[in-house]
Amino acid sequence: MTPPPTSTVPPYVSLIVRILTLICLLISFIVIATNNQTVSTVAGDVKIKFKDFYAYRYLIATVIIGMAYTLLQIAFSISLLTTGNRIGGEGFLLFDFYGDKFISYFLVTGAAASFGMTQDLKQLEGSDNYSKFLNTSNAAASLCLIGFFFAVASSIFSSYNLPKRI
């Protein structure tokens, strides 16, 4: 009797998904890092930027960590494509599996914190003055969320690549 077939994902598919993840996270980083607006108040003009809010700082942190992990995984994927050998052998598959799970859910917490902060700020009186800032923050969080979906796809692929043990 032959063993059941294993489902594996071709390395180039995994590489493409990781590159798409990196692109979304990079654009999210650029959008949130450059997000600022000058608002006129009774006390004078005030420049608001992402650094003024903990949730947006958290979004930047999750995006940076996500980009670092994704760059590492892209390097490993390129190595697998060019040499045909997986770095670290079968033990690396567990790092890949757990790392993908952690990073994907870490990214969604950054996006969720940013969405929540934006929603809270929109409910404040006078939020029309800084709606451009809030909309740009939502755009960055949305890109992080799209990056999360690509990271989940990578997570599913790494689950398929685990050896089947009975």
Swiss-Prot record:
List the subcellular locations: Cell membrane
The residues that carry sugar chains are 36, 129, 135
- Give the UniProt entry's GO cellular component terms: plasma membrane
Q: Which cysteines are joined by disulfide bonds?
A: none
Q: Name one GO biological process term.
A: response to wounding
| Organs and tissues of expression | Mostly expressed in stems and flowers.
In its UniProt entry, what is this protein called?
A: CASP-like protein PIMP1
User: What is the phylogenetic placement of the source species in the record?
Assistant: Eukaryota, Viridiplantae, Streptophyta, Embryophyta, Tracheophyta
